[in-house]
Amino acid sequence: MSLPRYPGEGPRDLSKPLEQVRVLVDARTAGQRLDLALAAVLTWRSRSSIARMIEQGMVRLQGRVVPPSRKVRVGDTIEVDIPQDPVAQPNQDARFDVPILYEDECMIAVDKPPGMAVHPSGRHLHGTLIHELHRRYRRPDEPDYDVVQRLLHRIDMETSGVVAVGLDEQFHHQVRKQFEDRLVQKGYLAVVHGRPVDDEGVVDRGIVPDKASAVRLKLTTCEPGSGQSAVTNYRVVRSNDRFSLVELRPETGRTHQIRVHMAAIGCPLVGDKLYGADEQLFLQGIAGELDDAGRDALVLDRHALHSSSLTFFHPRKGRDVTIEAPLPHEFADLMA
């Protein structure tokens, strides 16, 4: 979160929640409605939320409470009292079946198991990570402790490992911006078929829809400079006669990026129904028609991709934080 500094004010202490903002109106926002002018500054809040703050007297223009429609002028001072988020106090009596890797008043990071969706959508309306977190943090009868969880990033349902979730609106905005600006270091581990030609390398290939596929959501690679740019760094950790354990660090965050890139270099992920040897396995799986031969070909009942680490700047701690998830036992079994 980057706010314009009011003349004469020192740098803000990021280790504390933001309690008040003062804005000096300049030529860029002059003539706008008050709510629109504030929306350009309080970017983590919706316009309707800002309008409510104005109507509740939490915003003052030149020291006076005015309606959201009031036009602002060059040199006006806007003062905003920022409502504080509820305090995160986990319900210790609630069942929580996901391993916790890190937790503080601003966030929680968990080791998501494979097969769990991160949020409700489509066919997955129950049993998601968000449902689990609601049991731990939501307290509708105690507004001061009723915390809304906000995902900082997402991983596929079949992918296991680190998922970070914000428990504070300001914190979520600050860290989410790091993801958008590609400042977060994301590490993955995958078990792939075979062994890459080079033990270490970079896959720099754009990603586009695979028009030759019967599966609408399937993607494929193209030459650099076309499609969505995508870059993945990889390093072979160890190999046996069938598989390789590969460490991956994507520089971009495209849909299915690691799976597409590993398939493109001839080493698809173990268990990958869509980007493995036969996409018919994906269609059979969707239809519930996957037979024993298909399951044997896949080796695993999910694709072998694991979100192993996440490093980002924690604005309240004032330092980088690294969160790690241990190697899944099924990966270790494949590499034994």
Where are each of the predicted segments found?
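RNA pseudouridine synthases
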Residues: M1-A336
